[in-house]
Every structure is written in C-alpha cells, then in structure tokens.
Amino acid sequence: LRITDGGFPAGTHRALRGYRIRITARYRYAFFLSSFLPFLLSVFLLSSPTLAQPTKAFKQAIPPYTFQFPQDHASHPAYQTEWWYYTGHLQSNDRIFGYELTFFRVGINPNPQPGGSRWRMHTLYFAHFALTDEDGEQFFHKEEISRPALDMAGARENRFQVWINDWSAELADSAAHRIRASADFASIALDLVPAKPPVIHGHDGVSQKSPGVGRASHYYSLTRLQTTGTLTFEGETFEVTGLSWMDHEFGSNQLTDDQKGWDWFSLQLDNNRELMLYVMRRKDGTYEPTSSGTMIYTDGTWRHLSLEMFEIEATGAWTSPHSGGTYPHAWRIAVPSEQIELRLTPTVSDQELGKNSLIGVIYWEGSVVVRGTDQGRPVTGQGYVELTGYKGRVPGL
C-alpha cells in the first residue's frame, strides 16, 4: 500500500470520500497514532484474533540500557514506535537550504503470526521529507505511508537500513549515513559522516518523557554530521555541503493525557559545540519536570541538563494564516552553568506542517539561525525547532 498526495488504492475511495490526504513532515513522538491509527486499521487492517487479544505487550524503555553501535542504528521491533530523523543545512555557492528526512516504524501487533496473507499488517511505516529554501523564503513538504508487504517499506534488524518506496537511509560500508528522497519539489542524495560519536540522552540509556515506569524512550543523536551530495531543486542540481543532525528513538507508551505538547531544539554552534533541549508542556501551562537537555562538547563528550539548568524564553510570536494557530517565533535560550546565552530566529516564518492533513494534527517545525555568546565569546550557529500543541492538543503516544 502506498498513500501519497491523495493517491489511494482502488476500492478505498468510497470510505474516504470528502477527504484529501496530504500528510506532511515529521511527528517527533509519533503523536498522530491515537487519532490516525484507528482510521488506518479500519480501512486497511485484515482482521485477526491475535490482534484482538494480544498475548504480550510491546517492550518499554526501562533503565538500564546499554547502546551497542553500529547495531543500535538498526530497527527495534520489540518497541511500538521508532524513528530515524535527519535534519540539516546545505549550502551551494550563495544558496542555503534546510532539509528534513524522517522515517517512522509503528508497531500495531506485538504478536505477529507466521504465515497467512502477505498483506497482513502488523507494522506501518511513515516517512517525511521537507525542504526550506532560505533565500527564497519557501517551504515544501511531503509524506509517504506504506506497509512492509512486497518490500515496499521496511527496516532491518541486523543492520541499519530503512526505506519506503524510493526513499531510504542506510549505513554505508564507509560508516557514512546515506540518505535519499525525491518529491515533486526537490530530491536529495546525501552522504553524512559523523564527526563525533553518538550522544546518549537522559540517564542509564533512558530519556524520560513523563513520570512513571516506561514513559520514556531510548534516545541518542549524531549531533555533527559532515554532509556532501546533491540537491535538485527548481530544475537545477546543486552540489552541496553542510552539517546534519540525526536522532534515533524507540520506546512505547511515553506520554500522559496531562501533556499538551512540546518544544524541541537541536542547535549546532560554529565553535564545534551542540545543544539539545526539550520541554514537555502540560495543560496548566507548566513544564513537565522530566524535561531535559544535553550539552555536547568539542571532544564529543556530553553533559545531561535537567530542567532547572536551562532557560527558554519566547521573544516573538507568529500566527499562521492557514490554521490560525499562534506559535513562539523567536527565543532566548540560556544555560548559565555553561555561560551560554543564545538568540534563535526562524529562517522562514511559515514552516507550519499538517495544514491539509487528514489526521488533523497541525504543528510548526523548521530551521533557525543562532546568534549569541558561549563562554563570553560571540558565537553563531544553526538549528531546528519543533513546536507542537499550539493549534489544538497533541494526542499522546
């Protein structure tokens, strides 16, 4: 099954009459599951007694967990949700672009049975490709959805390779991450070489998202990936270089009903340091105490940051002409113990996603420029920011 830009297999149009699918971009914690998955199941899932009465549950992210690389780049189907997420900034002469390519694996049945129809669905795959033309102030995005039947989508357990149709990410023999995607607005063919080892977020291999056992993920990042390749855009092919960031998370049952959304930041400074921060926002307007971050140093070592160790202040706002949602649109970020004071500004105002989506989840995610001071010295940089729950509450995972 392939669903993209309104295309459906024969026989499903009657069930979907009145809807137009243009599901786009990335959903950091696969928050669309609670609203969209029942629909997918009702339309596509072949009935099975095993699905109705599972004999085991999906595995939860519980400490301690020791990452093993390169094995942990690969798929972890014992967990319900998993995503591989790439963002970066590409340059060719005077042109600058931001890009995003993300793959999701969503487990539906923790007890898949051997045999039966090849179309029986125990896993769904989603992929999102987005491009920000920073000079032209344009933003484009597309999503692919598929099941693993006939190898239309998949993620290997023995080595890192994930794909949907002709979109893919894999670990090459050279240890470079090789990513490929194409859409009507652009295509990319990039090789990403880590300049630093993987950074493990949280404590004991677990990044806690909300209180309670298992309400967490196993989460690591490659925070500085030297990037080369080609970008085809508006009929022209650019040889590009740049920096990318890769996240990989897997877990089950992470969020609570009390959480409305989150703000997430990945920042790459030009002094060879990086910063990741996220805050989970509750319905009463406060931050979840488990919100945290990670400071990454020039030598690849890192330091965990608890919520009280950093400050995030919105200094501007932007109201979407599409959804009417109002988002923070500029930020001051401080990490006093690291002597970091930063200002973030979006490269393009309108980087809102999901405005024509069937699932009805609307959020903002896009590239930002960074200016400020680090240890008393001027610093610049680049990053990506994700904002959810500002136009309606985000369903939980």
Please describe what each predicted stretch is:
Residues T4, P9-A10, R17, S349, ...:
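Intrinsic disorder/low-complexity signal
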Residues Q53-L397:
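Structured soluble/peripheral alpha/beta segments that form catalytic or ligand/cofactor-binding pockets
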Residues L1-F8, R14, Y19-T24, A30-P49:
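Short, basic, low-complexity termini and linkers enriched in Ser/Thr/Gly/Pro
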